[in-house]
């Protein structure tokens, strides 16, 4: 009897190969052929899971969001609102080699979004989810905050997180990133101490 291949495991292996191609050669090098070669499978085998380049890129972006979501959900909630928010936000920026590689790929996929509707939808969804997350974290710190002020500070925090992530991904590998925690903590403390 032929061996059944676990489709989810195969999909993850192929996306990992895609990430490798993007990380080493850039998103312009992505094709079914280059990803199949990186994964050590035939193009036909790859097409059974991902029929098009767009399907491959979209799946990679979705997996990246799933990975970040999993890390955020793993943050213990039994801590102060400030500590919890800090830990959650630090999972959204590249603070180690794995999250740096992931962010580099994320930036490449965002750049490709203008040419791919699937990536554009995912980019917009991720942006909206990040805003909502920032808003929930700030509301947790100050449950009595004025709605308009909360919206304003949520946009600001969203920009800080995006800018911090983009800045960190450009730092040289091995450079200390401890200062990133201070940026996040200072932003959250300023919100905690502010009056409406």
Say what each PLM segment does.
Residues 59-62, 70-103, 150-157:
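Hydrophobic alpha-helical connector segments
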Residues 10, 53, 60, 64, ...:
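Hydrophobic/aromatic residues within well-ordered alpha-helical segments
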Residues 13, 17-24, 70-71, 105, ...:
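Solvent-exposed, amphipathic alpha-helical segments
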């Amino acid at each position: 009897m032929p061996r059944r291949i676990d489709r989810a495991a195969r999909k993850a292996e192929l996306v990992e190969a895609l990430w490798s191609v993007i990380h080493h050669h850039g998103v312009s090098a992505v094709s079914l052929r280059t990803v199949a070669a990186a994964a050590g499978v035939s193009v036909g085998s790859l097409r059974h899971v991902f029929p098009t380049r767009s399907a491959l890129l979209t799946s990679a972006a979705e997996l990246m969001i799933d990975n970040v979501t999993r890390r955020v959900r793993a943050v213990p909630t039994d801590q102060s609102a400030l500590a919890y928010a800090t830990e959650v936000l630090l999972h959204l920026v590249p603070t180690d080699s794995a999250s740096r590689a992931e962010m580099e790929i994320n930036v490449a996929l965002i750049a490709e979004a203008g040419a791919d509707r699937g990536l554009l939808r995912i980019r917009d969804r991720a942006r909206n989810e990040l805003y909502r997350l920032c808003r929930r974290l700030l509301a947790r710190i100050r449950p009595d905050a004025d709605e308009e002020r909360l919206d304003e500070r949520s946009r600001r925090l969203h920009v800080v997180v995006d800018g911090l992530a983009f800045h960190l991904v450009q730092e040289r590998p091995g450079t200390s990133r401890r200062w990133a925690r201070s940026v996040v903590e200072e932003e959250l403390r300023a919100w905690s101490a502010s009056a409406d």
